[in-house]
Amino acid sequence: MRVLFAAAECAPMVKVGGMGDVVGSLPPALAKLDHDVRLIMPGYGKLWSLLDIPTDPIWRGQTMGNEFAIYETSHPSNGLPLYLVGHPVFDPERIYGGEDEDWRFTFFASATTEFAWNVWKPQVLHCHDWHTGMIPVWMHQDPEVSTVFTIHNLKYQGPWRWKLDRMTWCPWYMQGDHTMAAALLYADRVNAVSPTYAREICTSEYGESLDGLLNYISGKLRGILNGIDLQDWDPANDKSLPATFSADDLSGRAVNKQALQQRMGLEVNPDTYLLGMVSRLVDQKGVDLLLQVTERLLAYTDSQIVVLGTGERGLESSLWQLAIQNPGRFSVFLTYDDDLARLIYGGSDAFLMPSRFEPCGISQLLAMRYGSVPVVRKVGGLVDTVPSYDPIHKTGTGFCFDRFEPVDFYTALVRSWEAFRHRDCWRELQQRAMTQNYSWDRSALDYDQMYRDVCGLKEPSPDAAVVEQFSLGQGSDPSRQGQDSNAKKRTRRKKKGND
């Protein structure tokens, strides 16, 4: 099946959030299932120094009163075809922000639509977040192309109707209130990045004012869990770590813990409970909860805390003040450093994710992969990926709390600290977390089924037997599977959708 991914990010070249990881890692997993997968993204200025891009474009087009060029290259990690939309508006190295952000991404969506109509027509055009939200609207008139829209974060919804009226030729009645709403209305399938988040966004608490619309389209909405690249994130072969290790031999973690304590200016002590956090420092991630419980936690336990990330100025300043007030026990690094992030995953005893909401979350998967036990709030994808630790039955992979309240978070932290003191049980907990399977191969099977469903192809993938070891059901919402709110359109396509 021909599948075109359209997104504003793609790891490792352009990555701001989890969407970049998905767009960089899911396509090669789908290619293993015999899909012809290609990617298209804005031609940001930085890409010309990172990729081998031919001087001459493969095609030139015009849309929204502007000319653009399409350049073809390949993804540096997986070799899949990668198309770049060339236009001066993408020349600056910034990805998001700026007064022209709405116009830039609406233009990218329009150029992608022209590319799909004139250069390489996919059977499935897979769009990601509001930046590509107008593509399902424009492609809806083409019965040969099915559209899938993935919600990575419902909070970011794109330009409102009055802006779209001025930027595009699209009539008002096809736009919804904003770009996100338009995509939800016109995409043939919509998926969130975890089953729990797919259910949560249909409620007023998490629906970001779109819960009514999401309930209306619930027949085509489902949740598919994100995965991680098990080869890229492998503690047994990670060259950035001072010492490698595996679930069978955790001895290297002690070396990494010492290196992490030294690098972050903490007191070096192998018996101290070391907590790590790698995150955008924003309201969503629960940084305010951490600020409220840190002083008490440090006063009553022998814990240390390290934080890596950037974000809101106020939160950065508060974390910096905590570090000044608690030298040797609390350290913050206000930047993003991939090697340091890996050291935190591979050297910390536990990993903090007290999120206000969490569509899926990648960090908890990486933490478990590296033996750092997650302490998380029961929300979104954290519910689907971190079962609560039960010392009696020896099940679970982390410590969970329900309410977004300091007392709940503090209680979970103390429970984890007490468990850490029982080293044999803690080692078993680490090993159980490290052996969880959250590979993209498993998630790809669910996407494969969704593609086939939307195109009217019910037979399994030719190579599905190769990956039968992965559970088809886990990572998706069974109640959503096979539902179709647009049966007539699917019937028209059925005779056209061939591999």
From Swiss-Prot:
Its catalytic activity? [(1->4)-alpha-D-glucosyl](n) + ADP-alpha-D-glucose = [(1->4)-alpha-D-glucosyl](n+1) + ADP + H(+)
Region annotated Disordered, chain positions: 471-499
Locate the compositionally biased regions of type Basic residues: 488-499
Q: In which pathway does it act?
A: Glycan biosynthesis; glycogen biosynthesis
Residue ranges with Polar residues bias: 471-485
Q: Which species does this protein come from?
A: Prochlorococcus marinus (strain MIT 9303)
**InterPro entries in alphabetical order:** Glyco_trans_1, GS/SS, Starch_synth_cat_dom
Protein name listed in UniProt? Glycogen synthase
Q: What Gene Ontology terms describe what this protein does at the molecular function level?
A: alpha-1,4-glucan glucosyltransferase (ADP-glucose donor) activity; alpha-1,4-glucan glucosyltransferase (UDP-glucose donor) activity
EC number assigned by the record: 2.4.1.21
Sites where the protein binds ADP-alpha-D-glucose: K15
Functional summary from the UniProt entry: Synthesizes alpha-1,4-glucan chains using ADP-glucose.
**EC category:** transferase
Sequence similarity: Belongs to the glycosyltransferase 1 family. Bacterial/plant glycogen synthase subfamily.
**Pfam name, any one:** Glyco_transf_5
Q: Which UniProt keywords apply?
A: Glycogen biosynthesis, Glycosyltransferase, Transferase
For biological process, the GO terms are: glycogen biosynthetic process
Gene coding for it: glgA
Family matches, as SUPFAM superfamilies? UDP-Glycosyltransferase/glycogen phosphorylase (SSF53756)
Domain of life from the UniProt record: Bacteria
Concerning NCBIfam families, the annotation shows: glgA, PRK00654.1-3
